[in-house]
């Protein structure tokens, strides 16, 4: 494999010395970019875009052509895994993802099994293709949804505001939910390991909906299964460590518990105080975040002020990857995203080195 020209992102995740704070943005390849919209139109649909190796590579690289980002992230969707389990993923216009065959009957759950990874070969082909296109420019991040977040979509049949169906199952038939979560954990472990084999140099587990759970339920139905995945991941590839990032939106309450599951870094949403988060986790993990995506709707001056506040909050030394606290908004101005990236690089140097 080609030598990595910029490994700042990987070094920061492992708390090794860096010259500046690296940055990438969740959903950096997305609808806020006109070039993404053009490629998406060419593909025909979102799923066709995910499954077309050439076009998935193209949209992954697009933000790097515009911004001086320190990592690329595979263009895909967290719901590829349940789709490979036969649940029939589709996207209704304006409604987001849906499943034709949601898991609402015991008989369906009994039949659920870890999918053959060959059904996800298009994802691994994209990883290999993107690595080739990057040519060592920056590292490539692979990713998956967490077992609980995937289960939310699988049981609800799509997105939800109150998660009544899955919470009813959780409190009345936890045995059924355990079966789904265990299957998901095995599937995600195999899926991320296959991404690493294909060339992913770091991986992130997105627990988008973990924050809707009670304290006890988060530990029992989400964190336990993320720990299971982390324990089963390949941590070395191409002669170097493959860092694992765990991002639980709304998970700021559980940082101490999350810091103990073996991940290299924790993602923070924008509601957390990053300085307090650093004190709470100590030296156990690096931190990633946590600029409010809505702050990109501010002025260039307000964006710079917010960047400075977060960098000051984290303080001196390595172990911080700058990111948004959630995905970039589709209405964000790409020029403001550029100001964000350049400001992080400019202002962070004072916190590193001599």
Swiss-Prot record:
InterPro entries (UniProt xref): UROD/MetE-like_sf, Uroporphyrinogen_deCO2ase_HemE, Uroporphyrinogen_deCOase
Superkingdom, natural source: Bacteria
UniProt keyword annotations, A-Z: Cytoplasm, Decarboxylase, Lyase, Porphyrin biosynthesis
Record-level Gene Ontology MF annotations: uroporphyrinogen decarboxylase activity
Keyword Cytoplasm: yes
Primary location group: cytoplasm
Residues involved in substrate binding: 27-31, 77, 153, 208, 326
Annotated pathway: Porphyrin-containing compound metabolism; protoporphyrin-IX biosynthesis; coproporphyrinogen-III from 5-aminolevulinate: step 4/4
Catalysed conversion reaction: uroporphyrinogen III + 4 H(+) = coproporphyrinogen III + 4 CO2
Record GO biological process: protoporphyrinogen IX biosynthetic process from glutamate
Top EC category: lyase
Function description: Catalyzes the decarboxylation of four acetate groups of uroporphyrinogen-III to yield coproporphyrinogen-III.
Name recorded for this polypeptide: Uroporphyrinogen decarboxylase
Species name: Neisseria gonorrhoeae (strain ATCC 700825 / FA 1090)
């Amino acid at each position: 494999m080609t030598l990595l020209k910029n490994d700042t992102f990987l070094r920061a995740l492992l708390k090794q010395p860096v010259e500046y704070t690296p940055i990438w943005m969740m959903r950096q390849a997305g609808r806020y970019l006109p070039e993404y919209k053009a490629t998406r139109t060419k593909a025909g649909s979102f799923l066709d875009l995910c499954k077309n190796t050439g076009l998935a590579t193209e949209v992954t690289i697009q933000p790097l052509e515009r911004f001086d980002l320190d990592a690329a992230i595979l263009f895909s969707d967290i719901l590829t895994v349940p789709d490979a389990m036969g649940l029939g993923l589709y996207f209704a216009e304006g409604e987001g993802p849906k499943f034709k065959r949601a898991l609402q009957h015991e008989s369906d759950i009994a039949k659920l099994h870890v999918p053959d990874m060959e059904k996800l070969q298009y994802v691994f082909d994209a990883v290999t293709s993107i690595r080739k296109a990057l040519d060592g420019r920056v590292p490539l991040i692979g990713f998956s949804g967490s077992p609980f977040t995937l289960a939310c979509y699988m049981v609800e049949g799509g997105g939800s505001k109150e998660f009544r169906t899955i919470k009813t199952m959780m409190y009345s038939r936890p045995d059924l939910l355990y079966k789904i979560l265990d299957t998901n954990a095995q599937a995600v472990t195999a899926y991320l390991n296959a991404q690493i084999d294909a060339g992913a140099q770091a991986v992130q587990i997105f627990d988008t909906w973990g924050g809707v759970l009670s304290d006890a339920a988060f530990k029992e139905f989400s964190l336990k299964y993320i720990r299971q995945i982390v324990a089963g991941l390949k941590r070395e590839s191409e002669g170097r460590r493959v860092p694992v990032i765990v991002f639980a939106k709304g998970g700021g309450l559980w940082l101490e518990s999350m810091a103990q599951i073996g991940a290299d870094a924790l993602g923070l949403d924008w509601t957390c105080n990053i300085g307090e988060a650093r004190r709470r986790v100590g030296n156990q993990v690096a931190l990633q975040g946590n600029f409010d995506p809505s702050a990109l709707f501010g002025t260039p001056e307000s964006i710079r002020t917010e960047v400075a506040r977060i960098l000051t909050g984290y303080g001196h030394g390595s172990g911080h990857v700058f990111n948004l606290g959630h995905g970039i908004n589709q209405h964000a101005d790409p020029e403001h995203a550029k100001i964000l990236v350049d400001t992080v690089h400019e202002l962070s140097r004072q916190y590193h080195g001599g």
